[in-house]
């Protein structure tokens, strides 16, 4: 959050003191500095953790930072569409891991969820192109969940 606070302060100062192209350039510079800092931190953080944790534990930390959305989403898709192939499951997992990496860098919970939302849309498009009727799959899934006493 410090990275975002620095960016916000610079943007606020630029908007209060500059005009025109100078203001736009200062705002863009603040965004670029934020992106560069996030890029560094994104790789420094797991590297520092690796001194004390193994890969599985680092993934658990990443999942904690992103509210466990990766596995909830993956398990939901696998439960919703029991006929998914191993290839389809692997593609879904790959996209969700990518989403988690972006979500880790997001500045708040809404933006973390938005990162996953983008990839959920990508997954839905992928599955639809592969011939799955997602509306029908969701309806059948809801029936199965209800039959076993659960809720969605």
Predicted regions and their residues:
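Charge-rich (acidic/polar
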Residues: 1-152
């Amino acid at each position: 959050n410090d990275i975002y606070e620095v960016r916000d302060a610079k943007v606020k100062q630029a908007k209060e003191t500059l005009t025109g192209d100078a203001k736009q350039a200062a705002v863009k510079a603040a965004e670029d500095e934020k992106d560069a800092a996030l890029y560094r931190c994104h790789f420094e953080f797991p590297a520092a953790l690796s001194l004390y944790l193994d890969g599985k534990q680092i993934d658990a930390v990443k999942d904690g930072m992103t509210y466990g959305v990766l596995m909830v989403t993956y398990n939901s898709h696998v439960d919703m569409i029991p006929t998914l192939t191993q290839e389809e499951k692997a593609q879904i997992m790959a996209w969700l891991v990518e989403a988690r990496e972006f979500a880790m860098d997001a500045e708040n919970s809404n933006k973390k969820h938005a990162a996953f939302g983008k990839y959920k849309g990508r997954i839905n498009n992928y599955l639809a192109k592969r011939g799955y009727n997602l509306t029908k799959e969701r309806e059948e899934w809801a029936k199965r969940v209800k039959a076993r006493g659960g809720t969605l």
